[in-house]
């Protein structure tokens, strides 16, 4: 059985995630009507590049701050929390500033040569301003997670989302519906301004929280070195995965153009799948994403105490929940594809692709649960390796199959990639759960402290 605290926190986070998902889906539907499929596709291409830069900006600091603060709190007296956070914030500011400067300097070559559309250059330059905000918010969010007060960053993210929507809607009133360059820039500017607001709110909450709970009563031991040993390996693996994923997204419109579609038709096809259908497929996943995140400290606690039976029971319960829930969601999306596509996006193409991709939901949702179990058992390196292998294989398939078979090949590659990822991850989890009980006993001490503290 899943523990009561896990169920309680899952329901709490699910409620917040559901509210934000509803707001985000409504805004995405409005954007689809306001920008059109081609405009939405142009925005998605821009976000794929800014997402890579955001990975450079964060550079593993979210988990590093969570782990480092949790280790300091593990002493029971608050340790040197403020000193640890100063290092995390400096690291975040350095990486965020560097990523922002790099994006600003390379905006033209990225827009012209990499994305292949000059209309994205202005948006890339605007997005560069938000990179320090993203990295600093990640460090602060990690602090609140370690302290067990996750409602504070959740409040900041909700305020960020609402402000971003309001600002974007206001900025779009100043651009013509057919001017995709200015429309995309307006969306990017709204997001960047909202990131700045989120940072200001989170920093105020952090200062109040730190003064209320923690003061440095002792010097931390080699805090900078400990932080870098956590952040750098995570950053390197995230760079690889994000770069491969970005290349995948950039290859799709080019491959569709090579298959015979015009530039706008290729952008429209990409925009329908990535900007309309995929958000709708992931919209109901908030329940499983919350459970998969919160099961990490639960499994680690069982692991350190050598409770092999509880590990198997907890993991099995989550996987059964994910399978039942995802099958129900898949059936509803498949049967109601025409209604949802027409009602939300006013698009027959969205309805058609939604029906084609609905059977993939059980695979995606179950993979989400399996990844949570692997991280809770200290097998996140395997999970990252599988994700990188999936992205690399998908990149090769897109390069050779998309120009020949168009959107049909793209959908087939999505199916193959998700099945490949789930198969390898599930086999690794099954092998671990079926291994000798001694294999489930000794995670590293830092992981244990982090798990216990995050689960409080």
Regions found by a protein language model. Name each.
Residues 1-23, 79, 83, 218-241, ...:
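N-terminal membrane topogenesis motif
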Residues 5-63, 100, 104, 130-131, ...:
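Signature of the first transmembrane helix
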Residues 9-24, 190-206, 221-294:
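Transmembrane helical elements of multi-pass membrane transporters/channels
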Residues 20, 28, 59-66, 126-145, ...:
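Short runs within selected transmembrane alpha-helices of multi-pass transporters and secretion channels
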Residues 59-74, 281-305:
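Helix-loop junctions and terminal segments of transmembrane helices
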Residues 63-108, 122, 135, 309-329:
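Membrane-water interface segments that mark the loop-to-transmembrane alpha-helix transition
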Residues 98-116, 328-346:
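Short membrane-interface helical motifs at transmembrane helix boundaries
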Residues 170-177, 193-218, 249, 371, ...:
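C-terminal transmembrane helix end/exit motif
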């Amino acid at each position: 059985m899943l523990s009561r605290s896990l169920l309680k926190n899952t329901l709490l986070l699910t409620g917040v995630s559901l509210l934000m998902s509803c707001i985000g889906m409504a805004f995405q539907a409005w954007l689809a009507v306001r920008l059109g499929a081609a405009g939405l596709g142009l925005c998605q291409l821009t976000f794929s590049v800014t997402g890579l830069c955001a990975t450079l900006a964060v550079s593993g600091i979210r988990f590093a701050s969570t782990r480092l603060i949790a280790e300091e709190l593990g002493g029971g007296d608050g340790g040197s929390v403020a000193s640890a956070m100063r290092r995390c914030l400096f690291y975040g500011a350095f990486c965020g500033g560097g990523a922002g400067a790099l994006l600003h300097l390379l905006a033209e070559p990225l827009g012209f040569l990499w994305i292949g559309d000059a209309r994205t250059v202005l948006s890339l330059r605007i997005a560069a301003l938000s990179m320090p905000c993203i990295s600093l918010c990640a460090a602060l969010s990690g602090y609140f997670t370690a302290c067990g007060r996750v409602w504070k960053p959740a409040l900041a993210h909700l305020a960020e989302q609402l402000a971003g929507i309001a600002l974007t809607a206001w900025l779009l009133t100043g651009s013509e519906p057919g001017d995709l360059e200015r429309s995309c820039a307006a969306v990017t500017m709204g997001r960047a301004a909202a990131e700045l607001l989120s940072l200001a709110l989170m920093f105020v909450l952090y200062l109040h929280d730190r003064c209320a709970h923690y003061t440095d009563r002792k010097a931390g031991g080699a805090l900078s070195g400990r932080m870098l040993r956590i952040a750098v390996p995570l950053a390197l693996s995230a760079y690889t995965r994000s770069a491969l994923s970005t290349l995948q997204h950039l290859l799709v419109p080019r491959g569709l153009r090579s298959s015979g579609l015009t530039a706008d038709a290729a952008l429209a096809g990409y925009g329908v799948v990535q900007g309309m259908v995929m958000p709708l497929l992931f919209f109901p996943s908030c329940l499983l994403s919350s459970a998969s995140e919160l099961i990490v400290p639960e499994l680690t606690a069982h692991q350190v105490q050598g409770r092999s039976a509880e590990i198997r029971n907890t993991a099995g319960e989550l996987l059964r929940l994910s399978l039942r829930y995802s099958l129900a969601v898949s059936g509803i999306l498949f049967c109601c594809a025409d209604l949802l596509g027409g009602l939300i996006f006013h698009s027959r193409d969205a309805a058609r692709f939604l029906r084609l991709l609905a059977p993939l939901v059980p695979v995606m949702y179950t993979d989400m649960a399996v990844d949570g179990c692997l991280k809770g058992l200290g097998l996140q390196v395997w999970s990252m390796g599988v994700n990188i292998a999936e992205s690399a294989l998908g990149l090769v398939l897109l390069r050779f199959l998309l120009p020949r078979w168009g959107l049909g090949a793209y959908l087939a590659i999505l199916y193959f990639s998700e099945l490949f990822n789930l198969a390898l991850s599930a086999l690794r989890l099954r092998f671990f759960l079926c291994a000798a009980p001694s294999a489930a006993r000794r995670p590293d001490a830092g992981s244990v402290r982090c798990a216990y503290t995050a689960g409080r």
